[in-house]
């Protein structure tokens, strides 16, 4: 009997706990439903307020428009073009700007078609510049010829160049009357020339050493006539 009584008491206690747990769940459900209802009511109030504002703005526009038309009776609305629905969006930069695609930029042929290069004129080398440069540089053959000609010119190297005879320059009286501090003295230029006793062959060898001749240039003539 005692066991039966204990079992009944345990069953009653469990039933009471279940009832207590069911009560807060029902309360939570009722609270959540009430919150949803309040949120819906707030949304309805906001929509009603927005509609009322729109109606007020329309009424104000209806009042202002006739007043403006009375001031400007010939005023008309500015027409604007309607764009078709198949127009490309501005965000599609891949279609509008093919230069930004890396695949196209890697291909050299596509680069040439998209970005044409400016062709430069070829630099034409003038034939006149070549002998001028060659005249500045001595060839090996000419150097060898100079070494061969040096022993032939050794007996004539002791001769000293003689300058032209200096002639006095007459100055006008106006220049002579001025003080010397106002002008610099004029130094006469002295041009050396070889002695007239030098033979023609030695003179030609001497000229070839001083002024090497090349193809395309005339032979340098002596400065003064030579008498044999």
UniProtKB/Swiss-Prot annotation:
- Pfam families named among the record's database cross-references: Casein
Membrane spanning stretches: none
The UniProt keyword set, sorted, is: Milk protein, Phosphoprotein, Secreted, Signal
Record keywords: Phosphoprotein included?
A: yes
**Compartments in which it is found:** Secreted
PANTHER family given in the database record = BETA CASEIN, BETA-CASEIN
Gene of this entry: CSN2
Primary location class = secreted
* Protein name (database record): Beta-casein
For this record, the Gene Ontology CC terms, alphabetical, are: extracellular space
Q: In which tissues is it expressed?
A: Mammary gland specific. Secreted in milk.
So which residues are the signal peptide here? 1-15
Question: What is the native source organism of this protein?
Answer: Oryctolagus cuniculus
Q: Does the keyword Phosphoprotein apply?
A: yes
Family the entry assigns: Belongs to the beta-casein family.
Could you tell me which InterPro entries the record lists for this protein? Answer: Casein (IPR001588), Casein_beta (IPR016345), Casein_CS (IPR031305)
Give the modified residues of type Phosphoserine: 30, 32-34
């Amino acid at each position: 009997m005692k066991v039966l009584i204990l079992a009944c008491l345990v069953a009653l206690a469990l039933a009471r706990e279940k009832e207590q747990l069911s009560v807060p769940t029902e309360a939570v459900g009722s609270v959540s439903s009430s919150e949803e209802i309040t949120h819906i009511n707030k949304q309805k109030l906001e929509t009603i307020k927005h509609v009322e504002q729109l109606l007020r703005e329309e009424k104000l526009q209806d009042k202002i428009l006739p007043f403006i038309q009375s001031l400007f009776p010939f005023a008309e609305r500015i027409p604007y073009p309607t764009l078709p629905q198949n127009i490309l969006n501005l965000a599609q930069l891949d279609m509008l700007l093919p230069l930004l695609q890396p695949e196209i930029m890697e291909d050299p042929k596509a680069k040439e078609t998209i970005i044409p290069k400016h062709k430069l004129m070829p630099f034409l080398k003038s034939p006149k510049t070549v002998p001028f440069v060659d005249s500045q540089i001595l060839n090996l053959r000419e150097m060898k010829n100079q070494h061969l000609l040096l022993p032939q010119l050794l007996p004539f190297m002791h001769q000293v160049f003689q300058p032209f005879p200096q002639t006095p320059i007459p100055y006008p009286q106006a220049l002579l009357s001025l003080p010397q501090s106002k002008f610099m003295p004029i130094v006469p230029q002295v041009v050396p020339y070889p002695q007239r006793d030098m033979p023609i062959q030695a003179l030609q060898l001497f000229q070839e050493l001083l002024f090497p001749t090349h193809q395309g240039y005339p032979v340098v003539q002596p400065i003064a006539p030579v008498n044999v």
